[in-house]
Amino acid sequence: MSNIKRMAIVLVAVALVALVASSFKGSDVLDRSIILGVGVDAFGDYGIQLTVEVVSPGNGSEQVGTFSKTVTVEAKTISQDIQNVAEYTGKEASLGQCVVLILGQDYYENVDFTDLIEYFINHHSLKESTAICCCEGSAKDLLNNGGALAQSVSLAIATAMLDQTEKIAVSTNNLLKYTRSQNELDCTGFLNKVTFVPSENKDAQDSDKVMGYFTYRELAVFRGNRYVCDLNEEEVRGMSLFVEDVVGETFVSYQDEYKRTLQVNNKDVEQKRTDNGGFDITITISVRFGRTDSEEVSGILSSKKNDEIDPKLLDDVQQQAMQLATAFLAKQAEYNFDLLKFHESYRQKQGTSDQLAHKPTADFPVNLTIKVEEN
């Protein structure tokens, strides 16, 4: 390699280092508390306990690899809490890099949190794409746990929620989508319910910190920012069948005494209004065998993608899918919420009216058809 090329590489490397360094100059990390995640819990009578995960770069006096720390404050309003974070840390609290907002169970089950949502959606620096969820137990405890890979809890949860739709076949939400749902005719929306599952692993730097992983298999339903009910795993799977861009769902069936796993890799959902004030809904899902694709291992475990699927397996998947979808529809009718936007669909046709706004979800008859085909 010529000296000129070597010099060019050195200059490029120096430029990259300078660019990265400039993005973390004193006005950022040193002068501001960069918040990665926000947890909200109930505090006293109508108060709010706020727990934030803030960036904490390691230095000579800290443990090697320290990435973030949590700060907990209490106040009567969310704006006072944010001010208290600034006073506690001695730095301006910055929400520009916040990736997740978590509502604790005692808070979201008992409080109309409209003011909280309005504060965050109108905050000039918080991104509308910020993930929003709720959790089992307190948000403070959740943020003080350790993820399976010992990374930031906020980043771990936000990353999982961004990947849920494509990889784990569960609908997810962000701040903008949730806020819009609460301003539609039926004011119905949902939040993913995060649960921490402890493991026997220990943090090498903090032996007292509980390590584990997070699950997202349940949802909490809200109307007008007030809690309605939870959806269990079966009902969540049923709801996801109605969402066209949610794929990856797996079904297990038996063939010749062997378990066979079929995975949904394509879906078409057609929802039409009917003359009797209801809906005809047709869900067509395409499936294929779900197997490990390990062609790089000399073909020993390579996926046989051309295997034909026995029609009996397709029938079994259809029955399972119908059971899941029916369970969700029954829950929606029982608790009178509308995640399938039945009210909004008829509002677009008939216009807004008090009669439509107060129409029970159970009064929309649904004719459901599910088709399963091999991809």
Language-model features: locations:
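Membrane-proximal alpha-helical signals and transmembrane carboxylates
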Residues: 2-375
